[in-house]
Each structure stands twice: as C-alpha cells, then as structure tokens.
Amino acid sequence: MELQFLGTGAGQPAKHRNVSSLVLKLLDEINEVWMFDCGEGTQRQILETTIKPRKIKKIFITHLHGDHIFGLPGFLSSRAFQASEEQTDLEIYGPVGIKSYVTNSIRISGSKLPYQIHYHEFDDTSMGKILETDKFTVYAERLAHTIFCMGYRVVQKDLEGTLDAEALRAAGVPFGPLFGKVKNGQDIELEDGTKIFAKDFISEPRKGKIITIIGDTRKTSASVRLAKDADVLVHESTYGKGDERMARNHGHSTNMQAAQIARDAGAKRLLLNHVSARFLGRDCRQMEKDAATIFENVKVVRDLEEVII
C-alpha cells in the first residue's frame, strides 16, 4: 500500500509544485488505484509515474474549487483513449455538483467516454460511511472551508492471520485438503491420532491500516475524528507558523495546526501538503521543524513523492 503525491501545491500551479492530487495505490490489496482530487495538470503528472489510468477505479473529490477539479475532465477523456487496454468503469465520490461539472464538461467538449461513470454525491445529510467493500471502508465528514469540503478516512479491514506452512509440514500434515482445513481454522486429526489445532499454526489477525486525507480546512474537530489512530494523516498546510489569522480568514490551516490535529488524534505519521508556492525548500524544512515541536513524525511532501504505508 502506497501514497503517491501528484500535486502538493495550493491554489495554482507553481514551478516546483502542481495543484492538488494524490493516489492511494492498492495494487497488492485489490489491484486498484484510488485518486483523491484531480487538479489541473494531473494527467501530465501521471506520465511521470508508473500509474496506469485504467487502474484508477475510484476518484474522491474533497471540494469543488478549481485547483482540486480542473484536471478531471481531461483525465477522464485521456483515460478513454487507451483503446488497446480494457475499458473499466469508474466511480466518482464528492460533493453535490461534481456530477453536473463532469457531465457538462464532457458534453460541451463533445467528448465520448467508452466506460460508465457512477456518481456518489454528498451533502451535510449524507456524511458518515460512504463506501464499504470486502476489504475497505471509507468514511467522510464535512470540514471547515469556505465552501462545502470533505475529509476522507480509509479503513482497511483487519487482515486474517497467516498460516505457518513450514511448522504444519513439520507436524506431519501433508500438503493438500488437510492444509486447507487448518488454513480455514478447522482442527484436524491425523491418521496416527495426532490432533492438530488450527490456532497453533495461524498467526493473530493483523490490524488493517487507516489513511486519513483532509481537504482544505480551518482547524476543526472533524479532522481529529477522521484522523483517530490513523497510520498516515495527510493534512493541508497552506500557511506556516504565525499565520493562524490569515489561515482562518481563508479557510485553511497552518503546519502547527495540522500537527495539533495529528497529536490530538493519536495519528502515527503526518504528511503536509497543499503548500503555498511562497514556501521553497528551506522554508519547508523550517515548517517541518516547527511542526515537529508538536508532533515529531512529520514531513512536507513533494510532487511525485511515494510513501509506503
């Protein structure tokens, strides 16, 4: 499981940062990639990666400001040009209005999509659990931006314990149907009367990962709830230390506020993105140092950076 950041800037493209987009790579888990936001130039950024557009099966939009959605029509159209590859349907999750934006853009531009898009729109009355699959559950809450904006909490369901095949063979169990029974948690008895207890050969279930992705927002308790015990919290940091009033006036957060959210939520790791273009390399290192006085495991991410979860 990996995160890759396609755009980490705020507001408009800059030389060193594109606007908002990131992907959650779930190739080993479900052979899919999930995208979060799709700002202008996202498809160009994808060309610098190993991501295959047809693997992107779900897109989650945090809000309808242009730096988070202006790349969506272009990406959807380019995804359709992959005639040599299997066309797969796509699901888009986001605030009310995202369907109208996409369908009108496709219609007005005369674009044709050879795959279906299934829309899931949300408002204040439909927050909470928004998606559940065999392996993942996704929750959403409203944040505190200048327009309706959502944060997402992706919860991987607990993983089954693994079978210690070598120990089972050493205990005299032949590979075959009996192996399968033990793997499924059944106790068995061998021909010589030896009893094999499945619990002795299967490890304890492993806790699934939690990934929280916070859209544009002022500091809010909703962010703490979404980030509770998260393995990774991705939080916007449009502003730096001392800019709290400006951040509040514009519906954004500082690095220090993001660190407070991570600390209060008990998150394990904080990744700061949506960084203003005025913050360059040295400034970003200072942002990390300042935030680390509140929450130690913090990093300002860069475009195209990959993070293993």
Curated annotation (Swiss-Prot):
<feature type="binding site">
    <location>
        <position position="65"/>
    </location>
    <ligand>
        <name>Zn(2+) 1</name>
    </ligand>
</feature>
<comment type="similarity">
    <text>Belongs to the RNase Z family.</text>
</comment>
<dbReference type="GO" id="GO:0042781">
    <property type="term" value="F:3'-tRNA processing endoribonuclease activity"/>
</dbReference>
<dbReference type="InterPro" id="IPR036866">
    <property type="entry name" value="RibonucZ/Hydroxyglut_hydro"/>
</dbReference>
<keyword id="KW-0862">Zinc</keyword>
<feature type="binding site">
    <location>
        <position position="274"/>
    </location>
    <ligand>
        <name>Zn(2+) 2</name>
    </ligand>
</feature>
<feature type="active site" description="Proton acceptor">
    <location>
        <position position="67"/>
    </location>
</feature>
<feature type="binding site">
    <location>
        <position position="216"/>
    </location>
    <ligand>
        <name>Zn(2+) 2</name>
    </ligand>
</feature>
<keyword id="KW-0540">Nuclease</keyword>
<dbReference type="Pfam" id="PF00753">
    <property type="entry name" value="Lactamase_B"/>
</dbReference>
<comment type="function">
    <text>Zinc phosphodiesterase, which displays some tRNA 3'-processing endonuclease activity. Probably involved in tRNA maturation, by removing a 3'-trailer from precursor tRNA.</text>
</comment>
<keyword id="KW-0255">Endonuclease</keyword>
<dbReference type="Pfam" id="PF12706">
    <property type="entry name" value="Lactamase_B_2"/>
</dbReference>
<comment type="subunit">
    <text>Homodimer.</text>
</comment>
<feature type="binding site">
    <location>
        <position position="67"/>
    </location>
    <ligand>
        <name>Zn(2+) 2</name>
    </ligand>
</feature>
<keyword id="KW-0479">Metal-binding</keyword>
<feature type="binding site">
    <location>
        <position position="68"/>
    </location>
    <ligand>
        <name>Zn(2+) 2</name>
    </ligand>
</feature>
<dbReference type="GO" id="GO:0008270">
    <property type="term" value="F:zinc ion binding"/>
</dbReference>
<feature type="binding site">
    <location>
        <position position="145"/>
    </location>
    <ligand>
        <name>Zn(2+) 1</name>
    </ligand>
</feature>
<dbReference type="InterPro" id="IPR013471">
    <property type="entry name" value="RNase_Z/BN"/>
</dbReference>
<keyword id="KW-0378">Hydrolase</keyword>
<protein>
    <recommendedName>
        <fullName>Ribonuclease Z</fullName>
        <ecNumber>3.1.26.11</ecNumber>
    </recommendedName>
</protein>
<keyword id="KW-0819">tRNA processing</keyword>
<feature type="binding site">
    <location>
        <position position="63"/>
    </location>
    <ligand>
        <name>Zn(2+) 1</name>
    </ligand>
</feature>
<dbReference type="InterPro" id="IPR001279">
    <property type="entry name" value="Metallo-B-lactamas"/>
</dbReference>
<feature type="binding site">
    <location>
        <position position="216"/>
    </location>
    <ligand>
        <name>Zn(2+) 1</name>
    </ligand>
</feature>
